[in-house]
């Protein structure tokens, strides 16, 4: 008799995705981050759902409702800081996941890669809107500054910004719609994740060598399920440590001051995971140019498959490309640091240099080094 997991209409979908899925035998721990992102998404949806039961999206009561959650709701403080720090964990896993894709050439599966870029944009939008909800100083001014960037779009600028605000400034209408979208987007992200997995399972996973592994496959369960569970435990331990010992570590002190349109904070900045893009935005003196650079800093990932010039898929056997890749990582760390600094000398010039390097490495140096490596292979 055939096992029910192979015949039942629902169970066979789960079986072919997580149990009998053929997986390359050489996958390293860098392949754990996809499943870790799934756990992060689950934690975010659950904690967010319970917080939404107590939160009020009104400018008069939003800040107080968050205080009420932390003080009066059973384990409300835990839910709030799991959500806030869970977002940081989400982005750590997300950036490592994208970095893995760049290093090992996973972007050659173009459908999976493009859905991944869509997912990145959706998660960034969700996080931005979530940061506005506590209605602290940085929430209000962050929303004002970022939504104002749309005024750089010619001809429709004023109409577009006021349409998004729902009025002539960031106010009650803005907060209400941001809450509605913040609640909705994680479910759209979940749907996109399913499409992401659908396309991935069409082609099968890449592996560290970048060489087709069809002759050497192993079942996903028990080998990679056990490996994933170890990853879950490590990540959840790190998250619990952060939440229980230093929940305020990654937040901004200004966001514990209620929003006041009459007082501007000394340094308006987003959460740490957006600082690299914020630094690129600020490095260009022109408003429209800055907005285009900001969008391109993420959208550039979409043209990475086109720029792949190497005869090898992975960087595993390409030492010159490896050096460039780690230089790119160093540039991203530099941009993240600069994004949190005030706009003054020497931070301005460092930010501009790092921004130029970021685009230069991806657009020119990587393809050129790949061609050099191709030539050296012949030699």
From Swiss-Prot:
A ubiquinone binds at residue 201. SUPFAM superfamilies: a domain/subunit of cytochrome bc1 complex (Ubiquinol-cytochrome c reductase), Transmembrane di-heme cytochromes. PROSITE patterns: CYTB_CTER, CYTB_NTER. GO terms for biological process: mitochondrial electron transport, ubiquinol to cytochrome c. It comes from the Eukaryota. Heme b b566 binds at residues 97, 196. Pfam families: Cytochrom_B_C, Cytochrome_B. Heme b b562 binds at residue 182. InterPro entries: Cyt_b/b6_C (IPR005798), Cyt_b/b6_C_sf (IPR036150), Cyt_b/b6_N (IPR005797), Cytb/b6-like_sf (IPR027387), Cytochrome_b (IPR030689), Cytochrome_b_C_euk/bac (IPR048260), Cytochrome_b_N_euk/bac (IPR048259), Di-haem_cyt_TM (IPR016174). It is a multi-pass membrane protein. Signal peptide: none annotated. Its cofactor is heme b. The chain crosses the membrane at residues 33-53, 77-98, 113-133, 178-198, 226-246, 288-308, 320-340, 347-367. Keywords: Electron transport, Heme, Iron, Membrane, Metal-binding, Mitochondrion, Mitochondrion inner membrane, Respiratory chain, Transmembrane, Transmembrane helix, Transport, Ubiquinone. GO terms for molecular function: metal ion binding; ubiquinol-cytochrome-c reductase activity. PANTHER family: CYTOCHROME B. The cytochrome bc1 complex contains 11 subunits: 3 respiratory subunits (MT-CYB, CYC1 and UQCRFS1), 2 core proteins (UQCRC1 and UQCRC2) and 6 low-molecular weight proteins (UQCRH/QCR6, UQCRB/QCR7, UQCRQ/QCR8, UQCR10/QCR9, UQCR11/QCR10 and a cleavage product of UQCRFS1). This cytochrome bc1 complex then forms a dimer. Heme 1 (or BL or b562) is low-potential and absorbs at about 562 nm, and heme 2 (or BH or b566) is high-potential and absorbs at about 566 nm. Component of the ubiquinol-cytochrome c reductase complex (complex III or cytochrome b-c1 complex) that is part of the mitochondrial respiratory chain. The b-c1 complex mediates electron transfer from ubiquinol to cytochrome c. Contributes to the generation of a proton gradient across the mitochondrial membrane that is then used for ATP synthesis. Belongs to the cytochrome b family. This is Cytochrome b. The lineage of its organism: Eukaryota, Metazoa, Chordata, Craniata, Vertebrata.
């Amino acid at each position: 008799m055939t096992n029910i997991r192979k015949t039942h209409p629902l169970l066979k979908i789960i079986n072919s995705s997580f149990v009998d899925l053929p997986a390359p035998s050489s996958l390293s721990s860098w392949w754990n981050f996809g499943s870790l992102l799934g756990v992060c998404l689950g934690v975010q949806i659950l904690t967010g759902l319970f917080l939404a039961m107590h939160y009020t999206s009104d400018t008069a009561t939003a800040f107080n409702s968050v205080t009420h959650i932390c003080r009066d709701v059973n384990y409300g403080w835990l839910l709030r800081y799991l959500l806030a720090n869970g977002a940081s964990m989400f982005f750590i896993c997300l950036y490592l996941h994208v970095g893995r894709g760049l290093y090992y050439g996973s972007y050659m599966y173009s459908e999976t890669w493009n859905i991944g870029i869509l997912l990145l944009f959706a998660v960034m939008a969700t996080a931005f809107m979530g940061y506005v909800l506590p209605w602290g100083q940085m929430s209000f001014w962050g929303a004002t500054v970022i939504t104002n960037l749309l005024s750089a779009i010619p001809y429709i600028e004023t109409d577009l910004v006021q349409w998004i605000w729902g009025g002539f400034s960031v106010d009650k209408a803005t907060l209400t719609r941001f809450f509605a979208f913040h609640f909705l987007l994680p479910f759209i992200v979940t749907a996109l994740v399913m499409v992401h997995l659908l396309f991935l399972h069409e082609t099968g996973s890449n592996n560290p060598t970048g060489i087709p592994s069809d002759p050497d496959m192993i079942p996903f369960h028990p080998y990679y399920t056990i490996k994933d569970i170890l990853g879950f435990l490590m990540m959840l331990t790190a998250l619990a440590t952060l939440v229980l010992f230093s929940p305020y570590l990654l937040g901004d002190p200004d966001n514990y001051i209620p929003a006041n349109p009459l007082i501007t904070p000394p340094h308006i900045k987003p959460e740490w995971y957006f600082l690299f893009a914020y630094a690129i935005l600020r490095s260009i003196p022109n408003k429209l140019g800055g907005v285009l650079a900001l969008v391109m800093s993420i959208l550039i990932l979409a043209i990475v498959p086109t720029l792949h010039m190497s005869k090898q898929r992975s960087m595993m056997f390409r030492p010159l490309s490896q050096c460039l890749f780690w230089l790119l990582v160093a540039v991203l760390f530099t941009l993240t640091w600069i994004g949190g600094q005030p706009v003054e000398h020497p931070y301005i010039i460092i930010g501009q240099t790092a921004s130029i390097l970021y685009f230069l490495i991806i657009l020119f140096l990587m393809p050129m080094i790949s061609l050099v490596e191709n030539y050296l292979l012949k030699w």
